[in-house]
From Swiss-Prot:
Modified residues (Phosphothreonine): 153
Gene: Lef1
Keyword set, alphabetical order: Activator, DNA-binding, Isopeptide bond, Nucleus, Phosphoprotein, Transcription, Transcription regulation, Ubl conjugation, Wnt signaling pathway
Species this protein is from: Mus musculus (Mouse)
InterPro entries the UniProt entry points to: Catenin-bd_sf (IPR027397), CTNNB1-bd_N (IPR013558), HMG_box_dom (IPR009071), HMG_box_dom_sf (IPR036910), TCF/LEF (IPR024940)
Protein name (Swiss-Prot/TrEMBL): Lymphoid enhancer-binding factor 1
GO molecular function terms listed in the Swiss-Prot or TrEMBL record: armadillo repeat domain binding; beta-catenin binding; C2H2 zinc finger domain binding; chromatin binding; cis-regulatory region sequence-specific DNA binding; DNA binding; DNA binding, bending; DNA-binding transcription activator activity, RNA polymerase II-specific
Region described as CTNNB1-binding: 1-60
Organism phylogeny: Eukaryota, Metazoa, Chordata, Craniata, Vertebrata
Domain comment in the entry: Proline-rich and acidic regions are implicated in the activation functions of RNA polymerase II transcription factors.
Compositional bias (Basic and acidic residues): 80-96, 267-294
GO cellular component: beta-catenin-TCF complex; cytoplasm; nucleoplasm; nucleus; protein-DNA complex; RNA polymerase II transcription regulator complex; transcription regulator complex
């Protein structure tokens, strides 16, 4: 358990609680001693605003191991500072609340920034990296670098596994440049060529300009669904537009043809099915034409029909009625009002009409007309059933 500098009591746990925050006083740093001297005598140095601005400037300059102030210090002052940083790693936190210090620290990879969970960070709202944001204090502007982040780095947050940092390139030193006083940031570690993506996030990928030259990898391996890879590839690739699919023209590596190749076949099938439906109707019409048409033979008129035929014009002239039902009722009343002798005349005319009809159509029977109606109904039913059969099959093909 760390002890207070100058405090007595050795390692006695009764002097302080285990959860108490213990401040440490840095020794041997002239810059910090100057700050503590200014804090202890505020009335001599000026108002409170100048002290706060100097504190902000010092807190932003001192933790940066590669800044201008560290280079200007002597080597003897740098060594105890680094030793102190190894002993107390909490003092080197970034003043913005530890944006880049949430993950585990790797001492051998000082040039890299570890970002294990980007979605839980309050600074990253959508889980994506933001461009370098210039932060301006009262006097010194400080720029937060993005450290050459790969454009597909936001996709890493979908997987729970953290990528190990790559090996440090030997030809690029990560130490401080003595001429400019700025650190050389090594390039980011190589991103693996395969990312496990979620199905909902595939359609939101916008590839950069330099992604066109890279090889295309199948996306179906990252999905963990029970259905086969061909179906998942079809659903995922359908969300890409034509200009977003990289690589040379030709069939995809997943075995799915380009949408421009698939759609013409479907368009060619539809006219074929329509032509089949058009050919169904002429076949029924040709069958009707081939059958010999029998003329509809009317049955011979009886006595009442002959009377109606003769007296209809007189009733229409006498009455203003134009409805046939009302005219037929009037003619029926008048027919029943006739005497037997008057009706006998019309019965004789009806008998002659039947004889003439038998001479003209010797084998005719009244059943032929009624049988034709039944035949027509049967043909209509057969046409409707046979017509819907091919139509339904053509629709499902």
């Amino acid at each position: 358990m760390p002890q207070l500098s100058g405090g007595g009591g050795g390692g006695d746990p009764e002097l302080c609680a285990t959860d108490e925050m213990i401040p440490f006083k840095d020794e041997g740093d002239p810059q910090k001693e100057k700050i503590f001297a200014e804090i202890s005598h505020p009335e001599e140095e000026g108002d409170l605003a100048d002290i706060k601005s100097s504190l902000v400037n010092e807190s932003e300059i001192i933790p940066a191991s590669n800044g201008h102030e560290v280079v200007r210090q002597a080597p003897s002052s740098q060594e105890p500072y680094h030793d102190k940083a190894r002993e107390h790693p909490d003092e080197g936190k970034h003043p913005d609340g530890g944006l880049y210090n949430k993950g585990p620290s790797y001492s051998s990879y000082s040039g890299y920034i570890m970002m294990p969970n980007m979605n839980s960070d309050p600074y990253m709202s959508n889980g994506s990296l933001s461009p370098p944001i210039p932060r301006t204090s009262n006097k010194v502007p400080v720029v937060q670098p993005s450290h050459a982040v790969h454009p597909l780095t936001p996709l890493i947050t979908y997987s729970d596994e953290h990528f190990s940092p790559g090996s440090h390139p030997s030809h690029i030193p990560s130490d401080v440049n003595s001429k400019q006083g700025m650190s050389r940031h090594p390039p980011a570690p190589e991103i693996p060529t395969f990312y496990p993506l979620s199905p909902g996030g595939v359609g939101q990928i916008t590839p950069p300009i330099g992604w066109q030259g890279q090889p295309v990898y199948p996306i179906t391996g990252g999905f963990r669904q029970p259905y086969p890879s061909s179906l998942s590839g079809d659903t995922s690739m359908s969300r890409f537009s034509h200009h977003m699919i990289p690589g040379p023209p030709g069939p995809h590596t997943t075995g799915i043809p380009h949408p421009a190749i698939v759609t013409p076949q479907v368009k060619q099938e539809h006219p074929h099915t329509d032509s089949d439906l058009m050919h169904v109707k002429p076949q029924h019409e040709q069958r009707k034409e081939q059958e010999p048409k029998r003329p509809h033979i009317k049955k011979p008129l009886n006595a009442f029909m002959l009377y109606m035929k003769e007296m209809r014009a007189n009733v229409v002239a006498e009455c203003t009625l134009k409805e046939s039902a009302a005219i037929n009722q009037i003619l029926g009343r008048r027919w029943h009002a006739l005497s037997r002798e008057e009706q006998a005349k019309y019965y004789e005319l009806a008998r002659k009409e039947r004889q003439l009809h038998m001479q003209l159509y010797p084998g005719w029977s009244a059943r032929d007309n009624y049988g034709k109606k039944k035949k027509r109904k049967r043909e209509k039913l057969q046409e409707s059933t046979s017509g819907t059969g091919p139509r339904m099959t053509a629709a499902y093909i």
